[in-house]
Protein backbone atom coordinates (compact mmCIF):
# COMPACT_ATOMS: atom_id res chain seq x y z
CA UNK A 1 0.00 0.00 0.00
CA UNK A 2 1.37 3.41 -0.96
CA UNK A 3 1.21 6.20 1.58
CA UNK A 4 1.17 9.85 0.62
CA UNK A 5 3.59 11.95 2.63
CA UNK A 6 2.83 15.62 3.15
CA UNK A 7 4.46 18.22 5.33
CA UNK A 8 2.72 19.78 8.29
CA UNK A 9 0.56 21.50 9.30
CA UNK A 10 -2.12 18.88 8.69
CA UNK A 11 -5.06 21.22 9.06
CA UNK A 12 -8.37 20.89 7.27
CA UNK A 13 -11.08 23.50 7.07
CA UNK A 14 -14.70 22.51 7.44
CA UNK A 15 -17.16 24.27 5.15
CA UNK A 16 -20.20 25.72 6.86
CA UNK A 17 -23.61 25.31 5.25
CA UNK A 18 -23.80 29.00 4.42
CA UNK A 19 -20.40 28.88 2.69
CA UNK A 20 -21.39 25.90 0.57
CA UNK A 21 -24.67 27.55 -0.40
CA UNK A 22 -22.88 30.78 -1.28
CA UNK A 23 -20.50 28.92 -3.57
CA UNK A 24 -23.35 27.12 -5.29
CA UNK A 25 -25.22 30.40 -5.81
CA UNK A 26 -22.12 32.12 -7.20
CA UNK A 27 -21.51 29.24 -9.60
CA UNK A 28 -25.13 29.51 -10.76
CA UNK A 29 -24.63 33.10 -11.88
CA UNK A 30 -22.96 32.39 -15.26
CA UNK A 31 -25.89 30.22 -16.31
CA UNK A 32 -28.38 32.79 -15.03
CA UNK A 33 -26.67 35.57 -16.99
CA UNK A 34 -26.64 33.57 -20.23
CA UNK A 35 -30.25 32.51 -19.70
CA UNK A 36 -31.26 36.15 -19.27
CA UNK A 37 -29.30 37.06 -22.40
CA UNK A 38 -31.29 34.59 -24.51
CA UNK A 39 -34.70 34.75 -22.80
CA UNK A 40 -34.88 38.30 -21.52
CA UNK A 41 -35.47 40.05 -18.23
CA UNK A 42 -38.27 37.70 -17.23
CA UNK A 43 -35.88 35.12 -15.80
CA UNK A 44 -34.26 37.69 -13.52
CA UNK A 45 -37.67 38.98 -12.40
CA UNK A 46 -38.79 35.43 -11.57
CA UNK A 47 -35.61 34.78 -9.58
CA UNK A 48 -35.90 38.00 -7.57
CA UNK A 49 -39.58 37.38 -6.86
CA UNK A 50 -38.83 33.80 -5.79
CA UNK A 51 -36.07 34.99 -3.43
CA UNK A 52 -38.45 37.49 -1.81
CA UNK A 53 -41.12 34.83 -1.29
CA UNK A 54 -38.64 32.21 -0.07
CA UNK A 55 -37.05 34.46 2.55
CA UNK A 56 -40.48 35.64 3.73
CA UNK A 57 -41.77 32.08 4.07
CA UNK A 58 -38.57 30.96 5.77
CA UNK A 59 -38.81 33.76 8.33
CA UNK A 60 -42.52 33.11 8.95
CA UNK A 61 -42.01 29.38 9.52
CA UNK A 62 -39.03 29.99 11.82
CA UNK A 63 -41.15 32.43 13.79
CA UNK A 64 -43.92 29.84 14.17
CA UNK A 65 -41.39 27.21 15.24
CA UNK A 66 -39.70 29.58 17.72
CA UNK A 67 -36.37 29.15 15.94
CA UNK A 68 -33.60 31.63 15.24
CA UNK A 69 -34.79 33.53 12.16
CA UNK A 70 -31.47 35.23 11.46
CA UNK A 71 -29.51 31.96 11.55
CA UNK A 72 -31.99 30.27 9.24
CA UNK A 73 -31.95 33.07 6.68
CA UNK A 74 -28.17 33.36 6.76
CA UNK A 75 -27.59 29.72 5.76
CA UNK A 76 -28.69 30.71 2.21
CA UNK A 77 -30.56 27.44 1.61
CA UNK A 78 -33.88 29.21 1.02
CA UNK A 79 -32.24 31.60 -1.45
CA UNK A 80 -30.68 28.72 -3.39
CA UNK A 81 -34.03 26.94 -3.62
CA UNK A 82 -35.63 30.15 -4.87
CA UNK A 83 -33.01 30.67 -7.58
CA UNK A 84 -33.39 27.09 -8.82
CA UNK A 85 -37.16 27.50 -9.10
CA UNK A 86 -36.76 30.89 -10.78
CA UNK A 87 -34.48 29.62 -13.55
CA UNK A 88 -36.56 26.47 -14.08
CA UNK A 89 -39.91 28.03 -14.95
CA UNK A 90 -40.68 29.98 -18.15
CA UNK A 91 -39.47 33.60 -17.90
CA UNK A 92 -42.88 35.17 -18.52
CA UNK A 93 -44.96 32.84 -16.33
CA UNK A 94 -47.60 34.65 -14.20
CA UNK A 95 -46.34 36.01 -10.88
CA UNK A 96 -48.69 33.89 -8.80
CA UNK A 97 -47.11 30.70 -10.12
CA UNK A 98 -43.64 31.51 -8.79
CA UNK A 99 -45.20 32.62 -5.50
CA UNK A 100 -47.17 29.39 -5.18
CA UNK A 101 -44.27 27.17 -6.17
CA UNK A 102 -41.73 28.83 -3.90
CA UNK A 103 -44.07 28.86 -0.91
CA UNK A 104 -44.82 25.17 -1.46
CA UNK A 105 -41.11 24.36 -1.65
CA UNK A 106 -40.19 26.17 1.56
CA UNK A 107 -43.24 25.59 3.76
CA UNK A 108 -44.37 22.11 2.71
CA UNK A 109 -41.46 20.25 1.15
CA UNK A 110 -38.72 21.67 3.37
CA UNK A 111 -40.20 22.54 6.75
CA UNK A 112 -43.10 20.12 6.99
CA UNK A 113 -40.51 17.34 7.20
CA UNK A 114 -38.37 19.11 9.79
CA UNK A 115 -36.42 21.76 7.92
CA UNK A 116 -32.97 21.83 6.37
CA UNK A 117 -31.37 18.39 6.34
CA UNK A 118 -34.61 16.49 6.91
CA UNK A 119 -36.57 16.91 3.67
CA UNK A 120 -37.18 13.73 1.68
CA UNK A 121 -37.44 15.41 -1.72
CA UNK A 122 -35.62 18.18 -3.49
CA UNK A 123 -37.77 21.25 -2.69
CA UNK A 124 -37.18 23.05 -5.98
CA UNK A 125 -38.05 20.01 -8.10
CA UNK A 126 -41.10 19.18 -6.00
CA UNK A 127 -42.35 22.72 -6.55
CA UNK A 128 -41.63 22.48 -10.27
CA UNK A 129 -43.63 19.25 -10.58
CA UNK A 130 -46.52 20.79 -8.63
CA UNK A 131 -46.65 23.70 -11.07
CA UNK A 132 -46.14 21.53 -14.14
CA UNK A 133 -48.94 19.12 -13.24
CA UNK A 134 -51.30 21.89 -12.11
CA UNK A 135 -50.62 24.42 -14.88
CA UNK A 136 -49.13 22.52 -17.85
CA UNK A 137 -49.90 25.22 -20.43
CA UNK A 138 -48.19 28.05 -18.56
CA UNK A 139 -45.25 25.84 -17.57
CA UNK A 140 -44.52 24.84 -21.17
CA UNK A 141 -44.95 28.28 -22.73
CA UNK A 142 -41.40 29.44 -23.42
CA UNK A 143 -40.56 32.43 -25.56
CA UNK A 144 -38.23 32.24 -28.56
CA UNK A 145 -34.51 32.81 -27.86
CA UNK A 146 -33.44 36.36 -28.62
CA UNK A 147 -31.23 35.32 -31.55
CA UNK A 148 -34.16 33.86 -33.51
CA UNK A 149 -37.09 35.79 -32.01
CA UNK A 150 -39.19 38.12 -34.11
CA UNK A 151 -39.63 40.31 -31.01
CA UNK A 152 -37.80 40.14 -27.66
CA UNK A 153 -39.52 41.51 -24.53
CA UNK A 154 -38.06 44.55 -22.80
CA UNK A 155 -37.93 44.85 -19.01
CA UNK A 156 -41.19 46.82 -18.95
CA UNK A 157 -42.94 44.34 -21.24
CA UNK A 158 -41.67 41.43 -19.13
CA UNK A 159 -43.07 43.04 -15.98
CA UNK A 160 -46.39 43.73 -17.71
CA UNK A 161 -46.75 40.10 -18.79
CA UNK A 162 -45.64 38.60 -15.48
CA UNK A 163 -47.93 40.83 -13.40
CA UNK A 164 -50.72 40.89 -16.02
CA UNK A 165 -50.87 44.64 -16.56
CA UNK A 166 -50.98 46.41 -19.91
CA UNK A 167 -53.56 45.08 -22.34
CA UNK A 168 -51.47 45.89 -25.44
CA UNK A 169 -48.78 43.30 -24.56
CA UNK A 170 -49.44 39.78 -25.84
CA UNK A 171 -47.42 36.68 -24.95
CA UNK A 172 -47.80 35.20 -28.44
CA UNK A 173 -45.83 37.99 -30.10
CA UNK A 174 -42.74 36.91 -28.15
CA UNK A 175 -43.12 33.25 -29.10
CA UNK A 176 -42.73 33.98 -32.81
CA UNK A 177 -39.44 33.21 -34.49
CA UNK A 178 -37.89 35.06 -37.39
CA UNK A 179 -39.66 32.59 -39.68
CA UNK A 180 -43.03 33.72 -38.29
CA UNK A 181 -43.68 30.34 -36.62
CA UNK A 182 -44.61 29.96 -32.96
CA UNK A 183 -41.67 28.40 -31.14
CA UNK A 184 -41.37 25.95 -28.27
CA UNK A 185 -38.26 24.54 -26.61
CA UNK A 186 -36.00 22.36 -28.80
CA UNK A 187 -36.96 19.19 -26.93
CA UNK A 188 -40.66 19.99 -27.17
CA UNK A 189 -40.34 20.83 -30.87
CA UNK A 190 -38.53 17.59 -31.63
CA UNK A 191 -41.01 15.53 -29.62
CA UNK A 192 -43.96 17.12 -31.43
CA UNK A 193 -42.37 16.65 -34.85
CA UNK A 194 -41.59 12.99 -34.22
CA UNK A 195 -45.19 12.37 -33.14
CA UNK A 196 -46.29 13.87 -36.49
CA UNK A 197 -44.15 11.45 -38.47
CA UNK A 198 -41.16 13.68 -39.21
CA UNK A 199 -37.64 12.33 -38.84
CA UNK A 200 -35.04 13.81 -36.52
CA UNK A 201 -33.11 15.21 -39.49
CA UNK A 202 -36.22 16.95 -40.84
CA UNK A 203 -37.03 18.44 -37.46
CA UNK A 204 -33.50 19.78 -37.01
CA UNK A 205 -33.93 22.01 -40.07
CA UNK A 206 -36.24 24.34 -38.11
CA UNK A 207 -35.03 27.73 -36.89
CA UNK A 208 -35.09 26.69 -33.23
CA UNK A 209 -32.19 24.31 -33.90
CA UNK A 210 -28.58 25.19 -34.57
CA UNK A 211 -27.06 22.06 -36.04
CA UNK A 212 -27.66 19.22 -33.59
CA UNK A 213 -28.55 21.39 -30.57
CA UNK A 214 -31.14 24.01 -29.73
CA UNK A 215 -30.52 27.70 -30.31
CA UNK A 216 -29.69 29.37 -27.01
CA UNK A 217 -30.02 26.23 -24.92
CA UNK A 218 -26.57 24.98 -25.93
CA UNK A 219 -24.95 28.11 -24.49
CA UNK A 220 -27.15 28.05 -21.40
CA UNK A 221 -26.10 24.46 -20.69
CA UNK A 222 -22.47 25.30 -21.44
CA UNK A 223 -22.61 28.12 -18.87
CA UNK A 224 -24.09 25.83 -16.22
CA UNK A 225 -21.43 23.23 -17.08
CA UNK A 226 -18.71 25.84 -16.52
CA UNK A 227 -20.26 26.79 -13.19
CA UNK A 228 -20.53 23.13 -12.23
CA UNK A 229 -16.87 22.49 -12.96
CA UNK A 230 -15.92 25.44 -10.76
CA UNK A 231 -18.17 23.98 -8.07
CA UNK A 232 -16.24 20.72 -8.29
CA UNK A 233 -12.95 22.61 -8.12
CA UNK A 234 -14.12 24.39 -4.97
CA UNK A 235 -15.09 20.99 -3.49
CA UNK A 236 -18.61 22.23 -2.78
CA UNK A 237 -19.94 19.07 -4.44
CA UNK A 238 -18.46 15.66 -5.21
CA UNK A 239 -18.07 14.34 -8.74
CA UNK A 240 -19.98 11.07 -8.37
CA UNK A 241 -23.59 12.22 -8.91
CA UNK A 242 -22.87 14.63 -11.76
CA UNK A 243 -20.77 12.03 -13.55
CA UNK A 244 -23.46 9.40 -13.02
CA UNK A 245 -26.18 11.67 -14.42
CA UNK A 246 -24.24 12.60 -17.54
CA UNK A 247 -22.95 9.07 -18.17
CA UNK A 248 -26.39 7.53 -17.63
CA UNK A 249 -28.01 9.98 -20.05
CA UNK A 250 -25.17 9.67 -22.58
CA UNK A 251 -25.15 5.87 -22.63
CA UNK A 252 -28.95 5.55 -22.80
CA UNK A 253 -29.30 8.18 -25.54
CA UNK A 254 -26.38 6.70 -27.50
CA UNK A 255 -28.00 3.28 -27.53
CA UNK A 256 -31.32 4.77 -28.63
CA UNK A 257 -29.70 6.90 -31.33
CA UNK A 258 -27.69 3.96 -32.71
CA UNK A 259 -30.80 1.78 -32.86
CA UNK A 260 -33.05 4.41 -34.44
CA UNK A 261 -31.32 7.63 -35.59
CA UNK A 262 -34.43 8.80 -37.47
CA UNK A 263 -36.62 8.85 -34.38
CA UNK A 264 -34.14 9.63 -31.60
CA UNK A 265 -32.25 12.75 -30.60
CA UNK A 266 -28.48 12.56 -30.59
CA UNK A 267 -26.57 12.26 -27.30
CA UNK A 268 -25.20 15.78 -27.87
CA UNK A 269 -28.71 17.21 -28.00
CA UNK A 270 -29.72 15.35 -24.84
CA UNK A 271 -26.67 16.64 -22.99
CA UNK A 272 -26.97 20.27 -24.09
CA UNK A 273 -30.74 20.78 -24.17
CA UNK A 274 -33.25 21.51 -21.47
CA UNK A 275 -32.02 21.50 -17.88
CA UNK A 276 -29.32 18.83 -18.27
CA UNK A 277 -26.28 20.66 -16.90
CA UNK A 278 -28.30 22.64 -14.37
CA UNK A 279 -29.73 19.43 -12.96
CA UNK A 280 -26.50 17.43 -13.13
CA UNK A 281 -24.45 19.91 -11.11
CA UNK A 282 -26.88 22.01 -9.08
CA UNK A 283 -30.03 19.94 -8.47
CA UNK A 284 -29.20 16.24 -8.37
CA UNK A 285 -26.19 16.93 -6.13
CA UNK A 286 -28.36 18.00 -3.19
CA UNK A 287 -26.66 16.01 -0.37
CA UNK A 288 -29.81 15.76 1.75
CA UNK A 289 -31.95 13.88 -0.77
CA UNK A 290 -29.24 11.88 -2.56
CA UNK A 291 -27.51 8.60 -1.73
CA UNK A 292 -24.62 8.84 0.73
CA UNK A 293 -21.86 6.42 -0.28
CA UNK A 294 -19.59 7.08 -3.25
CA UNK A 295 -20.79 4.04 -5.18
CA UNK A 296 -24.36 4.79 -4.20
CA UNK A 297 -24.04 8.33 -5.53
CA UNK A 298 -22.86 7.07 -8.91
CA UNK A 299 -25.83 4.69 -9.06
CA UNK A 300 -28.14 7.49 -7.92
CA UNK A 301 -26.87 9.80 -10.66
CA UNK A 302 -26.99 7.11 -13.35
CA UNK A 303 -30.57 6.33 -12.38
CA UNK A 304 -31.50 9.97 -12.92
CA UNK A 305 -29.80 10.02 -16.32
CA UNK A 306 -31.56 6.88 -17.53
CA UNK A 307 -34.93 8.05 -16.20
CA UNK A 308 -34.51 11.37 -18.00
CA UNK A 309 -33.92 9.59 -21.29
CA UNK A 310 -36.91 7.28 -20.81
CA UNK A 311 -39.30 10.09 -19.88
CA UNK A 312 -38.01 12.39 -22.63
CA UNK A 313 -38.53 9.76 -25.31
CA UNK A 314 -41.55 7.83 -24.01
CA UNK A 315 -43.27 10.17 -21.57
CA UNK A 316 -45.65 13.07 -22.00
CA UNK A 317 -43.19 15.82 -21.05
CA UNK A 318 -40.27 16.94 -23.24
CA UNK A 319 -37.90 17.51 -20.32
CA UNK A 320 -37.93 15.19 -17.37
CA UNK A 321 -35.33 16.11 -14.79
CA UNK A 322 -37.82 17.10 -12.10
CA UNK A 323 -39.60 13.75 -12.29
CA UNK A 324 -36.32 11.84 -12.54
CA UNK A 325 -34.82 13.59 -9.51
CA UNK A 326 -37.92 12.99 -7.37
CA UNK A 327 -38.07 9.31 -8.36
CA UNK A 328 -34.37 8.96 -7.54
CA UNK A 329 -35.00 10.67 -4.18
CA UNK A 330 -37.49 7.90 -3.45
CA UNK A 331 -34.85 5.30 -4.31
CA UNK A 332 -32.04 6.89 -2.26
CA UNK A 333 -32.77 4.95 0.98
CA UNK A 334 -33.00 1.72 -1.03
CA UNK A 335 -29.65 2.46 -2.69
CA UNK A 336 -28.05 3.28 0.67
CA UNK A 337 -29.33 0.03 2.17
CA UNK A 338 -27.94 -2.24 -0.53
CA UNK A 339 -24.82 -0.25 -1.42
CA UNK A 340 -23.07 0.12 1.90
CA UNK A 341 -19.29 0.53 2.11
CA UNK A 342 -17.47 -2.32 3.81
CA UNK A 343 -16.51 -1.53 7.38
CA UNK A 344 -12.75 -1.59 7.87
CA UNK A 345 -11.66 -4.86 9.44
CA UNK A 346 -14.77 -6.78 8.41
CA UNK A 347 -15.01 -9.23 5.54
CA UNK A 348 -17.63 -8.90 2.79
CA UNK A 349 -19.13 -12.33 3.46
Swiss-Prot record:
Residue intervals passing through the bilayer: 20-42, 77-99, 124-144, 212-232, 239-259, 265-285, 291-311, 315-335
Membrane topology of the entry: Multi-pass membrane protein
Localisation per UniProt entry: Cell inner membrane
Cofactor: FMN
Enzyme class: translocase
Residue(s) carrying FMN phosphoryl threonine: 185
GO biological process, alphabetically ordered: electron transport chain; transmembrane transport
GO cellular component: plasma membrane
EC numbers, comma separated: 7.-.-.-
Subunit structure: The complex is composed of six subunits: RnfA, RnfB, RnfC, RnfD, RnfE and RnfG.
Biological function: Part of a membrane-bound complex that couples electron transfer with translocation of ions across the membrane.
Protein name: Ion-translocating oxidoreductase complex subunit D
Record carries keyword Nucleus: no
Keywords from the UniProt entry: Cell inner membrane, Cell membrane, Electron transport, Flavoprotein, FMN, Membrane, Phosphoprotein, Translocase, Transmembrane, Transmembrane helix, Transport
Superkingdom, natural source: Bacteria
Family indicated by similarity: Belongs to the NqrB/RnfD family.
Amino acid sequence: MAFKIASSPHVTRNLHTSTVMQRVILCLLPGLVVQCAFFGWGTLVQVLLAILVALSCEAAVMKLRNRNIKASLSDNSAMLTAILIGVAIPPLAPWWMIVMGTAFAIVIVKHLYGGLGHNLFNPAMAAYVLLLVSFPVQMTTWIAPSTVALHSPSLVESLQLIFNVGAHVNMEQFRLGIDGMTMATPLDTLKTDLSMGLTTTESLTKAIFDGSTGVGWFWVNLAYLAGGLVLLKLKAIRWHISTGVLLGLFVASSIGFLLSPDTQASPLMHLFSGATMLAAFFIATDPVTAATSSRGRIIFGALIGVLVYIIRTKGGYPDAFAFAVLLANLCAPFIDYYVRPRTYGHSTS
